[in-house]
Amino acid sequence: MGATYKNNIELTIFGESHGKAIGITIGNLPSGIQIDLDEVSRDMKRRAPGQNKMSTARKEADQVEILSGLQDGITTGAPLTGVIYNSDQHSKDYSLLKTNMRPGHSDYPAYIKYKGFNDVRGGGHFSGRITAPIVFAGNIAKQILKQKGIVVGAHILSIGNVKDERFPYNVDETLLSSLSQKQYPTIKEDVFEKMEATILKARENLDSVGGKVECVALHVPAGIGEPFFDSLESHLSSLMFSIPAVKSVSFGDGEMIDQMLGSEANDCYYYDENGDVKTSSNHNGGITGGITNGMPVSCTVTFKPTPSIAKKQKTINVETKENVELEIKGRHDPCIVQRAVVVVEAMMTLGILDMMGE
């Protein structure tokens, strides 16, 4: 089972949702970087479960114990390993799922690939729980990028049919800072009330909803990336699609850009009052030819509805070879989008830091 991303930096995740612990090892980080562990804790709390009625009732402190690579708060250059101990597992809720395949989950393909030995409790290694150590790694990367002047932020763009505003062309650090401090990061102040109603209605109906997260990175210098196979878009897409439940990734105007004419989609260059090169729009999301052009790097990530729902569904029993009905027990999110915002930020920061090492 592969669990390593390897380019200029290396990421190896480990653990299962209902195992003793989950964690990550980050290789090839620069030495001598001061890390603020309070900042790490703030991002961990943004993703943590059990904070409100719109997420799973599972409660995990998600405190990271750093085993190596950090001394007196400074990176040593050795692989940095962080571990998070699981404490609130209800494994009995999964007793039927060794043989009854959950629709929309990894159960059946994992059963085939790993010959039935995979851990299905809470999704095992396929679980969204494994994004907790990714957020830890992402915050380390976020702090390193911040020292280079690069700032990353994100917001909930939509939940179900309820939509927030998109980031403005001239998005600034003040807006990103404000969003990072909100429990429900939206640009429009009143939109999350409608999103909340959508989530709670789905839960009441024993169902779930999906949505979109929009993420930007400011002050990324021009010239980061490569054409074709090593484009920044290729690397960021690979990381974003590593987040469980992600089904679509686009950059700039993405899936809407095909409705434009070339004269509308082109981002025209100009010199500003300081002699810096800018573009008058950012339809391409700060990347052209696979390489950054100095404008904000922006992407939109789409999450499918949570597959674990309490509504009765049709499936198969792989032991009896029968068609059966399944009602999933346990504690599950009716929507993961609001908790995934910081995960998308983490992948953006890791991808940019990785490509800046080229």
Q: What are the language-model segments listed below?
A:
Residues 98-124, 316-332:
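Short acidic, glycine/tyrosine-flanked loop/strand segments centered on an H-E-D-like triad
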Residues 113-228:
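Glycine-rich, mobile lid/loop segments that gate access to catalytic sites or pores
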Residues 20-32, 128-150, 230-238, 295-297, ...:
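Alpha-helical support elements that line or immediately flank enzyme active sites
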Residues 1-58:
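N-terminal, positively charged regions that mediate nucleic acid binding
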Residues 10, 306-358:
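Internal helix-turn-beta structural module
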Residues 14-20, 206-323:
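Glycine-rich anion/phosphate-binding loop at the beta-strand->alpha-helix junction
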Residues 44-103, 107-109:
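Glycine-rich, N-terminal phosphate-binding loop and its surrounding beta-alpha-beta segment
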Residues 10-15, 118-130, 222-226, 282-288, ...:
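A short glycine/serine-rich beta->alpha loop
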